């Protein structure tokens, strides 16, 4: 059932590519294939226009069905939506970038991505999609194997996606400041966005300031902190106070008459950072989308930022992948 509070809209931020991107979207990570089509459809009815997907999430076909249903019913047009997907590491070789993008477009049932992102700054050994898809980090029980493709070659192929109108904007995810500095030295088309883990336990202030100063819009994933990682038996998440239950967050929620989740999302969006939460609860869908209609005080912003512990939950070695991407 769709939300009882439909037709909300999120403000947009301007990308350096010239396109506008909603500052609040719907993230598809860990959305079950069985419910994905309905969740996307209901999110569109609620007012969501940005959907953040990826090859690695394994639910792009289902997400596309939700989009197609909403378009068929006249709720939205394709041009009203901002659809994001990501290039997985097994497809970093320039000869595989365009086929990967076209495959994902076909799964969504669309002709172009509004934003196509390099998911991780590391190439993995190529896996034929006919053999395993999504390829994930490795086959079950095996170690991940790195590829032999430097990022500048991958980025050149990403730029060609823009040339061929398969992607309107291109971006990066999980990149360090050093990698961004290097990329900006050779990029013909600059990345429009940087997507990173960002919440009060991991503020990454230096990285965010550098990216924003260079004209990249920052998108935060895992805005609620440990919440999404508990079911993955992530030790860092299970041993930490949930941000939704933290006294600092709850105090602001009570003051503003909002939910703790809305406070966490507003802490990001008020600082110009896009967010991509998800929910299958109609009321929470609307609440998350409505997380820009109030302002936190400067003191509240500082108090929330002061919760920083440098605590990263999405760290490949923590789930058995032998690549210390973040050191």
UniProtKB/Swiss-Prot annotation:
Positions contributing to NAD(+) binding: 173-174, 222-231, 278-288
Pathway: Carbohydrate metabolism; D-xylose degradation
InterPro entries reported in the protein's UniProt record: AKR, AKR2D, Aldo/ket_reductase_CS, NADP_OxRdtase_dom, NADP_OxRdtase_dom_sf
Binding site for substrate: 119
Catalytic activity: xylitol + NAD(+) = D-xylose + NADH + H(+); xylitol + NADP(+) = D-xylose + NADPH + H(+)
Positions of the catalytic residues: 57
Keywords linked to the UniProt accession: Carbohydrate metabolism, NAD, NADP, Oxidoreductase, Xylose metabolism
Pfam families referenced in this protein's UniProt entry, alphabetically: Aldo_ket_red (PF00248)
Keyword NADP: yes
Transmembrane segments: none
Annotated GO biological process: D-xylose catabolic process
Major enzyme class: oxidoreductase
Keyword Transferase: no
GO MF entries: D-xylose reductase (NADPH) activity
EC number: 1.1.1.307
Site, as annotated: Lowers pKa of active site Tyr: 86
Family stated for the protein in its record: Belongs to the aldo/keto reductase family.
Chain's role: Catalyzes the initial reaction in the xylose utilization pathway by reducing D-xylose into xylitol. Xylose is a major component of hemicelluloses such as xylan. Most fungi utilize D-xylose via three enzymatic reactions, xylose reductase (XR), xylitol dehydrogenase (XDH), and xylulokinase, to form xylulose 5-phosphate, which enters pentose phosphate pathway.
PANTHER family xrefs: ALDO/KETO REDUCTASE
Full protein name: Probable NAD(P)H-dependent D-xylose reductase xyl1
Originating species: Arthroderma otae (strain ATCC MYA-4605 / CBS 113480) (Microsporum canis)
Name of the coding gene: xyl1
């Amino acid at each position: 059932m769709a939300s009882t509070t439909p037709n909300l809209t999120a403000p947009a931020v301007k990308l350096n590519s010239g396109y506008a991107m909603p500052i609040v979207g719907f993230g598809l990570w860990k959305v079950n294939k069985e419910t994905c089509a309905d969740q996307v459809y209901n999110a569109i009815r609620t007012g969501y226009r940005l959907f953040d997907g990826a090859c690695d999430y394994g639910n792009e076909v289902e997400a596309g069905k939700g989009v197609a249903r909403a378009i068929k019913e006249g709720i939205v047009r394709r041009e009203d939506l901002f659809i994001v997907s990501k290039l997985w590491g097994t497809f970093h070789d320039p000869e595989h970038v365009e086929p990967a993008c076209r495959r994902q477009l076909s799964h969504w049932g669309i002709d172009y991505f509004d934003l196509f992102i390099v998911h991780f700054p590391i190439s993995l050994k190529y896996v034929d999609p006919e053999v395993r898809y999504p390829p994930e980090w490795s086959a079950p029980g095996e170690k991940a194997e790195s590829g032999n493709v430097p990022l500048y070659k991958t980025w050149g192929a990403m730029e060609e996606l823009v040339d061929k109108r398969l992607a309107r904007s291109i971006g990066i995810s999980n990149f360090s400041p050093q990698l961004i500095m290097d990329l900006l030295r050779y990029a013909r088309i600059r990345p429009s966005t940087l997507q990173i883990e960002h919440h009060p336990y991991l503020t990454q202030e230096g990285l965010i300031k550098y990216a924003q100063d260079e004209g990249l819009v920052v998108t935060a994933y895992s805005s609620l902190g440990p919440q999404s990682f508990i079911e993955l038996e992530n030790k860092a998440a299970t041993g930490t106070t949930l941000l939704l239950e933290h006294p600092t967050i709850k105090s602001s929620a009570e003051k503003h008459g909002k939910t703790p989740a809305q406070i966490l999302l507003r802490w990001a969006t008020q600082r110009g950072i896009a967010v991509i939460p998800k929910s299958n609860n109609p009321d929470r869908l609307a609440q998350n989308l409505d997380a820009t209609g109030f302002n936190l005080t400067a003191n509240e912003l500082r108090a929330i930022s002061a919760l920083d512990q440098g605590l990263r939950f999405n760290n490949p070695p923590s789930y058995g992948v032998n690549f210390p991407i973040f050191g």
